[in-house]
């Protein structure tokens, strides 16, 4: 892992099109600004992990008999 030190109002450039700026530092809270192309998803780590978990749950296979039971309940 690359570790860089930055002060308020300084930036880090990633590749040609991603810039991370230090907006402010207040105690143990750091506010970041991120400029990146719209096609790049940017999430807090805990949100990203929750999305991955939900996607994993949604991708699980369900036995056909269970699906038929659900359809019968609907109709």
Curated annotation (Swiss-Prot):
GO molecular function: mRNA 5'-UTR binding
Record-linked InterPro entries: CsrA, CsrA_sf
Gene3D superfamilies: Translational regulator CsrA
Principal subcellular localisation of the protein: cytoplasm
Cellular localisation: Cytoplasm
Transmembrane segments annotated in the record for this chain: none
Domain of life of the organism encoding this protein: Bacteria
NCBIfam families on file: csrA (TIGR00202), PRK01712.1 (NF002469)
Subunit structure: Homodimer; the beta-strands of each monomer intercalate to form a hydrophobic core, while the alpha-helices form wings that extend away from the core.
Name of the protein: Translational regulator CsrA
Gene label: csrA
